A protein has these predicted regions:
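Enzymes that bind and transform nitrogen-containing heteroaromatic metabolites
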Residues: 1-167
Length: 167
């Protein structure tokens, strides 16, 4: 199984504003993310990301995607097809397919990296700096070496970096 962390970030590493606003993320980035998720067929998100994502009109693009929400407490999903797990490892056990995309929040992203469960990372850098916001990784005690596999321009002012996590 290949586990891919896929996130859009500001130049200074934020994945959302402090109020969870992600309206600054471009359509081109969304299209790239959506294609990656649909190709993998599996998506793992945190409960806050799930609540944000399911309110987006574009969420209908994921109707055929197996989705797992990682939540520490009991959590109610919108459909029976969306599963709930209480840890990154439990989420992966529910999705034993070839490829899985993880798209946090910062706490979930950090947990997956800390537990050494990520194989590849796609980072789409948006041309914006946010003074306050939610970081790509919440505070955890880890260090991982990466190998750059590819970089490409996904829009006039946006680039995508693709890394392999060295294990």
């Amino acid at each position: 199984m290949k586990v891919i962390l896929y996130m859009a970030i500001s130049l200074n590493g934020m994945i959302a504003k402090s109020d969870d606003d992600t309206s600054w993320i471009s359509k081109e980035e969304w299209d790239s993310y959506s294609l990656t998720v649909q190709t993998a067929g599996n998506l793992i998100v945190g409960h806050r990301t799930y609540n944000i994502l399911t309110k987006q009109p574009e969420f209908s693009e994921f109707k055929d995607v197996k989705l797992v929400v990682v939540a520490q407490e009991d959590f109610q999903t919108l459909t029976k097809n969306h599963l709930v797990a209480h840890s990154p490892k439990e989420a992966l056990k529910l999705l034993s397919d070839f490829e899985v995309v993880v798209a946090g929040g910062g706490a979930l992203n950090a947990s997956f990296v800390e537990e050494n469960l990520i194989d590849e990372i796609f980072i789409d850098i948006e041309p914006i700096i946010l003074g306050r916001g939610i970081p790509l990784f919440r505070d955890k005690d880890f260090e991982r070496k990466l190998k750059l596999l590819d970089q490409k321009k996904i829009a006039d002012n946006e680039i995508q970096l693709h890394y392999q996590v060295l294990k």
